[in-house]
Structure formats: C-alpha cells, structure tokens
Amino acid sequence: MDSAEPLTYDQYLATLPDERRESVARVWQVVRDHMPPGYVEEIGPKFLQFATGAEGYVALANQKNYVSLYLLPVYVDPSLKQKLDCVDKKLKVGKSCLNFNHHDDLPLDIIGEIVGTFTPQEFQEKLSRNRTSHRA
C-alpha cells in the first residue's frame, strides 16, 4: 500500500502490536460512542484523531512503550482536568496526554464524559477565547 493512501480503522489496528490492539480498540470505541456530531475522524499511520477544521479534539497514538490519549477539551476547560484528578486510579499523565498500556488503566467513563463535552462550535469558541486570553 502506498504510504500516501489513507488507512482504514481496521488497517490501523492491524499495524499495532497484538498486546495493544484490544486496548486501543476499546478506548477508541468509547471515544467514538461519546463523540458529538460534527467532528471528523482521521486515521493516519501513527494516530487516530477526531478534529474540527485544523484543530484536533481527541487523538490516540501508539508510542514505543505505551499508548497516548490526547484529550484537548481538558486544556480549554480546567474543570474537566479536575474530573481526571479525582479518579481513584493512578493515571500516567504526560504534558498533553494520558499514557497507558491497557484500557483498564483508564477511567473510561470519565473519558467518555470529557469527549462528549463540546460540540465543534463550542470547542472552537473556547479554544479561541483561551488563545486570546493567553496573549493578553
């Protein structure tokens, strides 16, 4: 397959190590089930993403030692981060993501809530306000 050709979801899953495939599929299914209408699903050779325009909303990427789930709504609304901070599980938090090896490492119910928070228009407006306030 030409590397410029877009992958299908099943093709993306097939590129993952066996031990990660089920967890990635379970986490991404939660994302899909809670995604508000209007976002576009994009599948690349290294990631899965829902975006609006040029802005990513939620993404999942297979890394060398773990899988990373990027939840951009958390960065435009601090109250959403507080939901993650209150979780009983010890989360592996990166600079802009949650890192995991198995889907059981994650609070999937809270992730679903976070994913479902903003319509594309609401997310774009929040993002724009945040960028404007950081420049001031």
Can you say where each PLM-predicted feature lies in the sequence?
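Charge-dense, helix-prone N-terminal extensions
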Residues: 1-136
